[in-house]
Amino acid sequence: MRLHCIVEDVDTARVAAEGGATVIQLRLKGVPTLAVVEAGRPVAALCRKSNAAFVVNDDVEAALALNADGVHLGRGDEGKELARAAGLMLGISATSIYEAIAAAEQGATYIGAGPIWETPTKPDAGSAIGLDGLAAICEAVKVPVVAIGGVDASNARDCIAAGAKGVAVVRASKDASEVRAAVDAAKTF
């Protein structure tokens, strides 16, 4: 759970794996399931070789076809029951204590909380919750929380100090080794 790197291609996944990613999440928004499966095959193989967990974003069917370790779903996405029944690790996004509690009740294996800070990667993510919002979510649920949104090597340690069990990065995936070093340096793990 320490370092989730969210990627769109195998080249970025490779850099993330070499940098110490513990989870590599393939996120291809608006892409049909068959295309996700095709793009995901080399990423899944890379994850198996590097011992990183492989998670597919928003597509339970693709996750199952790729024999992924898990799937990450948004609050309103369907497929949570299928993911749980299939034994997949289930990540669910949350932007508030209420949403985090609901995610835990829906069987989340982990909660992606954020955005912690504003991020250009996902302009529709809503208002930043900050470290105080992250800490409140971490205190409200027993499920591990992964901080996302504007996280990089300069602030990953702050997320861990606020109670997160890990951080998720998109833009910083190419700097995974620096983010991993910052996360590992946190004494609150």
Give residue ranges: language-model regions.
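Glycine/threonine-rich flexible loop motifs
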Residues: 121-123
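A short, flexible beta-alpha/helix-coil linker loop
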Residues: 29, 117-119
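Conserved N-terminal beta1-alpha1 strand-loop-helix module at the mouth
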Residues: 1-110, 126-132, 136, 142-145, ...
